């Protein structure tokens, strides 16, 4: 790259990519229903002692603020304020060993996550037993 403008542009893009990745998964994420393609909620992921958890902080218009598939102590519990993602730990740039709760079914699944799209997307996979027996949702970072 002999052109100084090209060099500066390349350096700036490298810095932006590094900053996006440095944020990790902490922050707010808009969930998108993988069946309808519509946004459903905003989840805030926080970190405490290397463990990442996610709590619903906002629902999109038209989404009921009650847990439809919940039973026991979560029956008809409000979704806003509910922790649905627990126990993720960073390992080699990926987030593993967690659990994700599906309010629609009332089931809890094993979970893992990975940043995509320069840190603007989070691929969250919920599964039973082995990862091949699950499904992935792509959440979008809320800025």
Predicted regions and their residues:
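Exposed beta-sheet edge/beta-hairpin loop segments within beta-rich domains
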Residues: 113-115, 130
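Bacterial N-terminal signal peptides that target proteins for export
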Residues: 1-11
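N-terminal signal peptide c-region/cleavage motif recognized by signal peptidases
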Residues: 16-20
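Short aromatic-glycine motifs in intrinsically disordered, low-complexity regions
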Residues: 70-76, 123-130
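Edge beta-strand at a domain terminus
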Residues: 121, 127-143
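Central antiparallel beta-sheet cores of small beta-barrel/beta-sandwich binding domains
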Residues: 26, 31-111
